[in-house]
Amino acid sequence: MRIQDSSTIDIVAAAIIVYNDQGFVKSGYGHYEYDDDGNIVREVKDNKSMISEMIVSGRTFTDEELKAANELSDSINGKMMLKKLTGQLNNFEANVVKALSEAPNNFAVSIIASLPHSIAVDKKREAVNDRMAQLKHSSQFFGEKGNRYDINVEIVDVKYIQTSSVYMITGVYAGKDIV
C-alpha cells in the first residue's frame, strides 16, 4: 500500500505504536545499537521511516489502536481549532492542521510522526507550570549575594535554550523554594 492510499487515522495509529515502542527518534537520527563486543544488536530507525514501513507493508490496526488514534487526532484538532480562531497558530501547528485534514503524503507522515512526542512534552510542560504556579507563592529568597551554597534540590525541569546554547535547570529546595 502507498502512503497516499492510506488514511490519516492509520498514520496516527502507526505513530502512536512506534512512539510507544521506541520513543521519538527525529528524521535522520536513526542509529545502530551495539553490544559490548561491537556487534550490531539492533537498528533504530527514525519514527517517520518506521511509520512509512508499517503503512506500506499493509499493516492493519486493531479497534483499540484506531480508537487511540481517533482520540489523539480529535484532541489535537480541538486545541488547534481554538488557536486558529484566536490567530495564535505557529508554523508547526499550521502544518499539523494541514497534515491531519488533507490526504496523506510523506510530509504529513513526518509531521504526524512527532505528534505523540509533542503531546507528551506538552503534558510534562503543563505539570511543571502547575507546580511552579503553586510554588511561586511560598518560594523565598535565601542566602547572600556572592556566596556559594551546597544544597540538595529536586530537579523539576531541564530545558535546552537553543538560541543561547545553554540548559535552564529548574529545581526546588526544601519542597518550597524555586532554585
Roles of regions detected by a PLM:
Residues 3-7, 17-127:
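Long, charge-rich alpha-helical interaction segments
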Residues 165-179:
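Beta-strand/loop nucleic-acid-binding surfaces
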